Amino acid sequence: MRHLIEEYGIGSQSFEAVKQVLKEQGALLQEGMILDATIMHAPSSTKNKKGEPDPEMHSVAKGDQWFFGMRCHIGVGAASGLVHSVVSTAANVHECNSAAERLHGEEKVAYGDSCHLGIEKREDFEGSSCQFRIAMRPGQRRALPDALKGWLEDLFEMAKAHLCAKVEHPFRMSKHQFGFQKTRCQSIKKNDDNLKMLFALASLYKIRK
């Protein structure tokens, strides 16, 4: 069954179908978007017929640790917290490189963590009217002056962080409720299809009431 689902891209089709229904019901508002990504570790046991690790997966450093696998980039509605877009890449692909695919072009504002700093200068967003409200780097925030201006900037950073926390819900659902903490099969495309199915279910779960 799983192979049939992967072969026909049922996960991607389900994700688009759920998204369309949510739009028609007015649940998936498009004026604001939150951008984020997470690394999906590829276990060494997931090997091809030659006994080699998946060649599409790559290593990347995050802090002082190295990870091998893929990166799942998502765009989440700032108002609804529902997943609007999913882009899967090798782990070494920077988050800014997938930003244009995660935004639909009608946003008035987009939020993201400090990994997205400088996004507004990219060619993809030249002439865009979207406001990019990207978090400061932790070191910059710690260095804010202990004065009124610094306090106000820190409050603004707190507000952005509180809003961006909405993006953690679909990641938590996919990893903990649905158990997708590591890649499940060969190829980024197949894992992407699995993830889209889970994010569709996460959106339905979120609006169940």
Each PLM stretch: what is its role?
Residues 108-109, 114-193:
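Helix-centered, glycine/charged polyanion-binding patches within enzymatic domains
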Residues 1-131, 137, 198-204, 209:
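Polybasic low-complexity intrinsically disordered regions
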